[in-house]
Amino acid sequence: MGKFGDFSSICRMAPIPLCASVGPITSIATGVGIEPDCYARNIEVANTIIFQGAASVMHIVALVMTVVMLLHVRGKFTAVGRKEITTFFYLYMILTFLSLCIDAGVIPPHSGSYPYFVAVQAGLASALVTCLVINGFVGFQLYEDGTPLSLWMLRLCSFVAFVISFLVGLATFKSWAGLGPTNTVGIFVVLYFLNALQLLLYVVMQIILVTRTLQDRWPLGDIAFGLFFFIAGQVILYAFSSPICEGISHYLDGLFFATTCNLLAVMMVYKYWDSITKEDLEFSVGTRMNNWEVKELLPQGPEEDRRATVYADPIYEGHYASGPGTGSGASASGYEGGHHRRESHGYTPSPNRQSLRY
């Protein structure tokens, strides 16, 4: 077990992108970088080698599912926190697309631009978690949702989190400000420690919200499942990635399971938000048919009396009819209840890493 903030043991177990830009410079390697003990085998498509084929497929699935969730969220015009939760899904979509490019090898690990993209990925991860926490405050109605105050506070807090993680990550990869590939305490703190605290804060806030303001307790199940999927993905990635990879002959590794579990956790966030919000159908007639309530039948003229019908007119006179989806029970939208300053551009993967066999 290494010291606090050391990525040596982590990177040998888990094939995470930043491992290509941290670690000591040895006499054998041409640059920094820690290669995992086992990683998923590459695939070849149109004379192009693609890293992490299974994980890349899951990234594409995650993009499709995010689009579906966004369409559902945008369809609930009057739901509480609609614009705020939409920002969360947009950030997740951008992070997933960038992770797809990095994991699949579209951005080569030995290129000069690779550390910058990994730093952006770290910044987006922190911004995503911060955005989720700010969304957690919306339910307490401390301020009006959807207003410039709410939206700009969400954007500014997420942007600050992005800038902090991006700068700390870039300083670590480029040996700036006392940080470096062998001094990774800073990026460890902002990526793991602070983000874990924010996620814990979000879970506690939502439990308080459900138990104290809502009569329905089913949303607690969404929180529990989301927490389970996220923790399971992290445990598989950082504790069992190499054994799984070796056990199934390099076809999959922990990154595939972590990507899948992260998607399921995000889907539980959507399910939780959907279960504690409802919309006012009176203001959603643009996407739903027959939402009008008929107060009274129109008076019949002489020419209408000549129409042949098997129903007697007096039966319908003076009665009220209502279209589906409306009624007096509809309520307003709301909640239901080294010392060497050597510039490095990442390591050059070993010949086995470029092979299609492993």
UniProtKB/Swiss-Prot annotation:
A single GO cellular-component term on record: endoplasmic reticulum membrane
Keywords (A to Z) from UniProt: Cell wall biogenesis/degradation, Endoplasmic reticulum, Membrane, Protein transport, Transmembrane, Transmembrane helix, Transport
GO molecular function term, any single one: unfolded protein binding
Biased composition, class Polar residues, residue ranges: 347-358
GO terms (BP aspect): cell wall organization; chitin biosynthetic process; protein folding; protein transport
Segments traversing the membrane: 49-69, 88-108, 117-137, 159-179, 185-205, 220-240, 250-270
Pfam families: Chs7
Subcellular location field: Endoplasmic reticulum membrane
Region: Disordered, residue numbers: 321-358
The keyword Metal-binding appears for this protein: no
Topology within the bilayer: Multi-pass membrane protein
General function of this protein: Chaperone required for the export of the chitin synthase chs-3 from the endoplasmic reticulum.
Family that this chain belongs to: Belongs to the CHS7 family.
Subunit and interaction comment: Interacts with chs-3.
Protein name per UniProt: Chitin synthase export chaperone
Organism encoding this protein: Neurospora crassa (strain ATCC 24698 / 74-OR23-1A / CBS 708.71 / DSM 1257 / FGSC 987)
Gene name of the record: csc-1
